[in-house]
Amino acid sequence: MNPENYLYLSALLFTIGAAGVLIRRNAIIVFMCIELMLNASNLAFVTFARMHGNLDGQVFAFFTMVVAAAEVVVGLAIIMTIFRSRRSASVDDANLLKN
């Protein structure tokens, strides 16, 4: 398969994720869209690494996955805290944690 196809797929996935972050108000959906954007960037890194014949993109994608795993833990903890206090998972309720 042509490497450009992987880059087009990566751009499409990133665009879908960015649109989801900007349009949706549910925190869990926004969180999933951010993860989709991270996976799209990983696909682009691995594709560029494959095109140039080195492993730098694959190593960077691995570290991105490690950071994404830590982000999942912290993000879900914050979403659960908002849901427990307000019974809603809307991102509009995030500023209510200040009190």
Swiss-Prot record:
Q: Which GO biological process annotations does it have? A: ATP synthesis coupled electron transport
EC class: translocase
Q: Mind telling me which residue stretches traverse the membrane in this protein?
A: 3-23, 28-48, 59-79
Q: What is its EC number?
A: 7.1.1.-
Q: Could you tell me the membrane topology recorded for this protein?
A: Multi-pass membrane protein
Instruction: Report if keyword rRNA-binding is assigned.
Output: no
Superkingdom of the source?
Answer: Bacteria
Q: Which reaction does it catalyse?
A: a quinone + NADH + 5 H(+)(in) = a quinol + NAD(+) + 4 H(+)(out)
Identify the NCBIfam families for this entry.
PRK05715.1-2 (NF004320), PRK05715.1-3 (NF004321), PRK05715.1-5 (NF004323)
Q: Which HAMAP family match?
A: NDH1_NuoK (MF_01456)
Q: Can you tell me which family this protein belongs to?
A: Belongs to the complex I subunit 4L family.
Quaternary structure?
Answer: NDH-1 is composed of 14 different subunits. Subunits NuoA, H, J, K, L, M, N constitute the membrane sector of the complex.
Q: What does this protein do?
A: NDH-1 shuttles electrons from NADH, via FMN and iron-sulfur (Fe-S) centers, to quinones in the respiratory chain. The immediate electron acceptor for the enzyme in this species is believed to be a menaquinone. Couples the redox reaction to proton translocation (for every two electrons transferred, four hydrogen ions are translocated across the cytoplasmic membrane), and thus conserves the redox energy in a proton gradient.
| Protein name stated in the entry | NADH-quinone oxidoreductase subunit K
Q: Which organism is it from?
A: Rhodococcus opacus (strain B4)
Q: What is the lineage of its organism?
A: Bacteria, Bacillati, Actinomycetota, Actinomycetes, Mycobacteriales
